Amino acid sequence: MRVALLVIGRPRHAGLADAIRDYEGRAAHYWPLDVIEVKEEPGRNLSADVVREREAERLVARLPADAVVVACDPGGVTMDSAQFARWLQEQRESARNVAFVIGGAHGLGPAVRERANRRLSLAPWTLPHEVARMVMAEQLYRAGTIIRGEPYHK
């Protein structure tokens, strides 16, 4: 099983970028991890809807063809860390690749939601997309430690 993490843009804040790289590196010890950074739409004179649509087109174009697509979206299902680890383990046992998609500053466009096999809420709050990326990377790492019975998860 391969895990892809599709995100809009690169982290702008140095401290957050360091934390993201750290957790993505840790997660890669448990799952073959492909981080795919898609160009952010410069939306200075565009509506949020247009920005979402253009970014969604780019994200969908980069999705692995054979992956179970999970849209990270506040309206999705919630799982605690143990449930998330079990779900990932089920995907691994079924030899399914998984692609998690995190939208940009304006969220995910309809094209991503339509392509998604499921929607996952990372929190009931609105998160900056860089923070959502860090949370997703940390949860991938945590899920790996749960599955292996390592002491990180308490």
Swiss-Prot record:
S-adenosyl-L-methionine binds at G103. One of its GO terms (molecular function) is rRNA (pseudouridine-N3-)-methyltransferase activity. GO terms for cellular component: cytoplasm. Its EC number is 2.1.1.177. It is found in: Cytoplasm. It comes from the Bacteria. It is an enzyme of class 2 (transferase). It holds the Pfam family SPOUT_MTase. Keywords: Cytoplasm, Methyltransferase, rRNA processing, S-adenosyl-L-methionine, Transferase. Belongs to the RNA methyltransferase RlmH family. Homodimer. Specifically methylates the pseudouridine at position 1915 (m3Psi1915) in 23S rRNA. This is Ribosomal RNA large subunit methyltransferase H.
